[in-house]
Amino acid sequence: GPCAFMDEYHPATVFSSIDKQGRYAYANQPAILTWNLTRLAETLIPLINQDRKIAIASLTEVLQLIKPVYENYWLINMRSKIGLLKDDPKDYELINNLLQIMDEQNADFTLTFRFLSKTLIGNNKDVRSLFVNSDKFDAWLMLWQERVAQEEIPDEDIAKRMNEVNPIYIPRNHKVEEALDSAVNKNDIEPLSLLLSILVKPYEEIEGFELFTQPAPLSEVPYKTFCGT
C-alpha cells in the first residue's frame, strides 16, 4: 500500500491519496496493527480448535497482549532515541512532551533526534534552529539534560549511542521522486545509485551531502502516494 517517510512530526500525517478520514495516519498505526492481526486471527479460528468458542477465547487472549507489548517496545525505542537506558517512570511524559512541542512547531522528526545528540557536545544551535519558538524546547532540553545526568555515562558516549539509532539520512520523499523520475523518464539511474549508496549507511554523516538531510521544499508538500506506488 501507500508508504512514505514523515518530515515534520505530526501525528495526523497521512500520505495515501484515498485516506480522507486519516484511518492510516501515523498516530493510528498501533490501532491498525491490532485490526490487521485481528483479521488474521479470524482466519485461523478453524486451525486453533474445532470448538469455535474455545478458539476465539484463545485468540482473544493473545490479541489482548498486542497493546502492552507495543507500548513497552515503543518506550524502549523512544528512550534509546533520546539517549536513555535506565528505566524512569517519568520518561513517558518526557518523551511525549518533546513530541508535542515538535508537533506544535513543525519540527522535522528525523533531524530533531539526530541534532539532539549534538547538544551533548556543546552544539545547541542546530536543534534549536528546527523550532520556530525555541523557548518551550529550551525548557524541555533542561529537563532532558537532568535526566541524562542520571545515566552516569559520559555525554560523548551518550551522543555516540544516540547517533547509532537516529539516522541522519532517510529516503526523503522528494529525493525518492527525483531518483525515480530520472530513471524512468530520463533513463538515468545515477541519482538512484547515489541515493542508495547514502541510504545503506544512514547513520554515517557524509560531508557534502547536506541536501539529502533536508525536508522537502514547501512547493512539494503535502506529498501523496497511491496504491501500487
Identify the function of each model-found stretch.
Residues 17-229:
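Regulatory N- and C-terminal appendages and interdomain linkers associated
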